[in-house]
């Protein structure tokens, strides 16, 4: 592939990221007008992210057949930070702030693409808007798709975004009603 074609591909990915960021910002603005309460917008962003995450889990597993099955939260954090987040957001992430028992940790995104071109007003943040909750919801949805129930919340700290993840339980496979083994 020629150098010019590679440069054009890189430029188109950057344009796509910028377009996504601006479109996301416009969508959140419209949601704030529709819902009026920033907490309700955060709930809706979480639901949207959850629905995206359930679909992204299948896509991720199809593209990454060599990723081992996770059996604990440290492995989950490792796969999220080394594979999933760089794959879908194009950024690096780190896991830290583990609680005793390894049931809760924080993923730090140092360059959140959603907040790259946006400055969220402080009064909306203090009123309960979590602008990056879409990402936390996507992580929650993806993990639920692979049978891990977690709680996830996002906090934008200005310089970076922190996603706090708390493990709740391993979900059991269940057959639809009326079907037995």
UniProtKB/Swiss-Prot annotation:
Here the disulfide bonds are none
Answer whether the UniProt record assigns the keyword Ribosomal protein to this protein: no
> Which coarse location class applies to the principal site listed for this UniProt protein?
Golgi
Output the superkingdom of the source species. Eukaryota
Output the Gene Ontology cellular-component terms.
cis-Golgi network membrane; cytosol; endoplasmic reticulum; TRAPP complex
What's the family? Belongs to the TRAPP small subunits family. BET3 subfamily.
The protein's role, per its UniProt record: May play a role in vesicular transport from endoplasmic reticulum to Golgi. Required for the systemic spread of the RNAi response.
Protein name per Swiss-Prot or TrEMBL = Trafficking protein particle complex subunit 3 homolog
Species annotation: Caenorhabditis elegans
Gene name linked to the record: trpp-3
């Amino acid at each position: 592939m020629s150098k010019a074609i590679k440069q054009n591909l890189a430029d188109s990915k950057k344009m796509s990221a910028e377009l996504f960021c601006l479109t996301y910002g416009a969508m959140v603005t419209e949601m704030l007008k529709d819902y009026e309460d920033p907490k309700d917008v955060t709930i809706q962003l979480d639901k949207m992210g959850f629905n995206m995450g359930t679909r992204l889990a299948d896509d991720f597993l199809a593209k990454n057949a060599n990723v081992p099955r996770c059996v604990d939260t440290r492995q989950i954090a490792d796969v999220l930070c080394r594979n999933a987040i760089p794959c879908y957001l194009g950024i690096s992430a780190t896991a830290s702030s583990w609680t005793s028992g390894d049931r809760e940790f924080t993923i730090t995104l140092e360059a959140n693409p959603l907040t790259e071109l946006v400055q969220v007003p402080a009064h909306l943040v203090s009123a309960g808007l979590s602008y990056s909750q879409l990402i936390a919801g996507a992580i929650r949805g993806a993990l639920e798709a692979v049978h891990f129930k977690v709680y996830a919340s996002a906090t934008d700290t200005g310089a970076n975004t922190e996603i706090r993840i708390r493990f709740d339980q391993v979900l059991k496979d269940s057959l639809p009603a009326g079907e037995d083994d």
